[in-house]
């Protein structure tokens, strides 16, 4: 037997609170805890703006592209039952149904509970289920024609309307007896259910949901409004898509990879996005017109888009701040990226990166060096601006020789806790060799949860030319594979982060090889993520470039000691990239 809720896309939407005194009777909460929907003919709670906004968004939203699929499905039903030419337009149907809208169905009491200024619910076809209410009652109530309202006497009267009306979805919006009849007759496809997390006096309850038939399939964020928290859940009566079903070529079957997901999962995602802060969305709207190509890419699944999406989010929604350098930034706090090192080497392709410089700097760290001249002799200028006389003097390091960068990354990796004098001193066997220790743990105690390398030495911060940006990494071994997670406190999206992604990925490959493991995953956690003002225009260019497939990285398999690697032991294969983009470093 056909499921009419599926054919005609009939949903329920309701908000339920906890019932006062129920908490005292039972201390074991479950999905039935939230069941109160009315008291003395009105809502048990005072106006909740968040729930009202959600209700309006869900019941007003339409998707013209998805409607093609819905209409095709309904037409097939009509043809199958020889109804296509037999259904006449009901005289009660409003003329405005040529405009695609949703239908909302409610009982008489629910209609009467709506404030007059909101009647009828705008941009929706209002259907009232009542044996006693008459059309003239509605006209007289608001002194207008209320053409957007239809009165039916029974649930069965709804289906002739659904069969001959252009509509997107049909929502049952109350009250209790109406919900119950539709549920009892298996006429509800999904329930959009608001959980108002407070207790109120209630004399009307939502009917019990058959949890063998309906399962919770989506849960929203948690919100606060009118002195209570609330969230939104979706109960779904899931229907697997029949792979043999005839489907028109131009219809959309859903955004999820699993083929058994219904097409309207996309709508559910949109519903849950109802409360995006409009001011935030338009925060930096002066940049919005610059991302035509970026915005034309519908599914941004290439892993490089993790990085590009962060930049886009910061440029469009970031907070404008002054900063230490005087350049100024747009910034946001807290992101994460994951890269599968078993499949590719995440060397960004939307601009050409200086891979030799990345590797030389990493080898310099591994050797525990602090002498910037070593890098300059190799024409690697990453640290040049931080080693000048002016920069060191600004850090009150007047005694420090030019390009003596102090106890920075490599020194902390190899000599943590040792007393630093200058870049010429010999620190062999001084301090804690963290790098040696983590390699030993990976080899001999791989399940240890203390495989941590830390560059943030509070005692030494004032002695460093620049306190570390990427401050801590941890390693994880499972099934012969090594993963690394790195936390970065200060994240220069334009210049620094692309290098950091590549550097710690290479570092993971190197440690994996010397420990006889395979590289698995690099996870990058970003704290203060920022775009410098003088990088914005360059990054707009980068965002409008389409990523290429990532390259692969090959290491000399004969190297078994981390200190024995040289630049010639690294081969990047098939690095396809866009042109270099110049950006000035803010020092």
Swiss-Prot record:
InterPro entries: DHFR-like_dom_sf, DHFR-TS, DHFR_CS, DHFR_dom, Thymidate_synth/dCMP_Mease, Thymidate_synth/dCMP_Mease_dom, Thymidate_synth/dCMP_Mease_sf, Thymidylate_synthase. The active site is at 469. NADP(+) binds at residues 36-42, 108-110, 129-132, 174-181. The keyword Protein biosynthesis does not apply. It catalyses: (6S)-5,6,7,8-tetrahydrofolate + NADP(+) = 7,8-dihydrofolate + NADPH + H(+); dUMP + (6R)-5,10-methylene-5,6,7,8-tetrahydrofolate = 7,8-dihydrofolate + dTMP. One of its GO terms (cellular component) is mitochondrion. GO terms for biological process: dTMP biosynthetic process; methylation; one-carbon metabolic process; tetrahydrofolate biosynthetic process. Pathway: Cofactor biosynthesis; tetrahydrofolate biosynthesis; 5,6,7,8-tetrahydrofolate from 7,8-dihydrofolate: step 1/1. Its EC number is 1.5.1.3, 2.1.1.45. DUMP binds at residues 324, 470, 488-492, 500, 530-532. It comes from the Eukaryota. GO terms for molecular function: dihydrofolate reductase activity; thymidylate synthase activity. Keywords: Methyltransferase, Multifunctional enzyme, NADP, Nucleotide biosynthesis, One-carbon metabolism, Oxidoreductase, Transferase. Residues 9-237 form the DHFR domain. Substrate binds at residues 51, 173, 179, 194. Residues 301-587 are annotated as: Thymidylate synthase. Homodimer. In the N-terminal section; belongs to the dihydrofolate reductase family. Bifunctional enzyme. Involved in de novo dTMP biosynthesis. Key enzyme in folate metabolism. Catalyzes an essential reaction for de novo glycine and purine synthesis, DNA precursor synthesis, and for the conversion of dUMP to dTMP. This is Bifunctional dihydrofolate reductase-thymidylate synthase.
